[in-house]
Amino acid sequence: MIFVDTNVLMYAVGRSHPLKARARAFFEQALNEGWRLCTSAEVLQELLHAYLPVGRVTTFEDAVRLIERLDIEVWPLEAGDALAAASLATQHPALGARDLCHLASCRR
């Protein structure tokens, strides 16, 4: 199973970017080869946090449609994930809180 982080979805559905074609190719390959993809509710929150304040709700909706079309499993962010993230911080000091939550949910 492959975890899809926020930036990959943003590149795939967002405005022109040097990584847009690469992100779209990743999703096309995942679809063609039947890869199992997952993400988390925290990623959805990050997308909404990025797009809502700048009036780009339709881009958020495009990301949600991509998640649905590719049948990407969306994991909840549980209280235990936040607690695990706090303990993972000492092992991974370069990661921020959100990335630590992603890591914790992947380890669950």
Predicted feature residues:
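Short, well-structured N-terminal submotif of metal-dependent ribonuclease cores
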Residues: 1-39, 52-65
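Active-site neighborhoods of divalent-metal-dependent phosphate/nucleic-acid chemistry enzymes
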Residues: 72-108
